[in-house]
């Protein structure tokens, strides 16, 4: 991200990313992938004791927040009507439950003094090996981080000619979401890849068509695909050449009204 200025990327309305969890060699710890065929009788697989990606060992969280603060749009200072959101930007950071306090602290040190926690509920758990031992994890977590004003918020509310909310047009959005898995049309590239369906929900809530969305930890490219399919301008950074190549050749080669191509992202 350090060289982002040379690409002349416009300021983002939304930065959304899944930062490395810093679990290193324990990434597959409770996952059946640790064993051949998912059965410990078969012995350990090639994934046992392996990290999912190289950046999980040396990710600099504070440097990440520093550059994100530079890539976001400036705060919206326009006067607001009562009960309205501003057009201010925000960040969404996926994380583990244990990372929440660390991310909140890091965000405050870089001007993101406010936050909204999000929970994503799954109907399955990857912690199969712990099923007969304890309660297993079936949730994902994220933080919406913002500076001062509440960020742009789109819940379907309509405005009349007098600038007032039209009754019964907006809907309440809860701080929990169903974790909707993607179909076979979305390639599986990254071990912690987030579903395009889930990303689309978030992008629709916090941006408008034509807004800029940036993913600083791009991985599979699923954020870019979700944003592009919704008519947002998408930009991403990825240091792992293998993930970059697969995202370019598999995730981002698709048609949106016959016009979408990888060259739209570079």
Task: List the model feature ranges, each with a label.
Residues 1-237, 242-244:
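Core catalytic lobe of class I
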Residues 258-266:
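Short acidic, low-complexity intrinsically disordered linear motifs used
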Residues 107, 251, 255:
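Conserved hydrophobic residues forming the short capping helix/wall of the S-adenosyl-L-methionine
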